Amino acid sequence: MIQLSKRIYTLLGVSLASLGIVFLLLAATLLTMVPLSSGFTERSAKAAIIGVLAFSLGIGLTLRQTKKDRHPTRTSLIFGILLPGIVGWLIFAAIIYALQDDLLFSPRTLSLDRATTVSQQFPQAQEVYIKSDAATLHGWFLPASNSKPAPLIILFYGQGGEASRYLRMAEKIPEASWAFINYRGYGWSTGTPSQDAIFSDGVTIYDHFAQHPLVDEGRIIALAGSLGTGPAVYLAANRPLAAVLLFSPYDSIAGGVAQDLIPFVPTKVLLRNSFNVMEYAQAAQSPLLAVIGDADQVIKPVRSYTLVENWAHTALQRVVPGGTHYSIYEDDETWEAIRDFLLKLAITTTN
């Protein structure tokens, strides 16, 4: 009975210490994700407090029971300390694996009120439904002011975006028509997002608009940011885009961006959706302009530089001094550089 009681206390101690390790790893991970949201700072602090308390209590119980043994060995002491670390790490890795899709994709819904607001603010916007395999993609086509075939800019946004939030961006290049289409599972698009689905959908969107009477098929551009640069790079390798404009591009998510944000587990092995776009960059058929913030802590500049260096076609980069993952979109000089880039390629005729 006494022996059973000792085992229960030891098991309880190891379990608490393991839980503490999980929370400490979570706290450290949330801290690396603060550039995504300042709210992670408070969550990280709370997780750290829980982790320290649980680990301290667990180790205390484990060592107390070990010392009560008549013949405690160094091995049992080391085992009592190392086991929680191993178990805690395995649990944390399992959590990351189980929640990987929730971490990678953050679909925003589209309310009826929001859709009504879009129609009021942009009366010229045409709602679009595009069939892509078993899914139906929803979004808007915003034609240029003239009635002739015009350049088209297809937007690919980041992981927490939603197409209706970006229509105002069309004011930056009014000479072009714009396509704002939601990924699967985002807005009113059906289906579930994944790497293969989003990549395939990008090609479907291109093919749909290439036949549109108000689109000049020879002047279709992909403009993408963050997560969305992946499908844009894939599209550049599979369709003859006139140009590619990328904000904060990456070489790989599983082996790069995710590893930077979650350095405690091998994300390259754990993540099903790798978003490794290097092979597509090396097969790109279009000129590139990459916009990179040198203070970007979400997608580190080295990730962007690697992609640019491996781009098969002409590649230019604009580095925004002090630019963060979000502020680079508000830089007026960047949009000036983009308009100049398109003008030199004869895609547009005005700057």
Task: Kindly give the residue locations of the regions a language model identified.
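Membrane-embedded segments
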Residues: 134-208
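Catalytic histidine-centered segment of alpha/beta-hydrolase-like enzymes
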Residues: 323-333
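Membrane-embedded alpha-helical segments of integral membrane proteins
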Residues: 12-64
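Short beta-strand/loop motif that positions the catalytic acidic residue
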Residues: 284, 290-296
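Acidic catalytic loop of the alpha/beta-hydrolase fold
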Residues: 295-299, 325-326
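Primarily recognizes the serine-hydrolase "nucleophile elbow" in alpha/beta-hydrolase
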Residues: 208-212, 218-262
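Short alpha-helix in the alpha/beta-hydrolase fold that links the catalytic acid
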Residues: 169, 277, 286, 300-309
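An N-terminal hydrophobic leader/cap segment in hydrolases
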Residues: 23-40, 44-45, 85-129
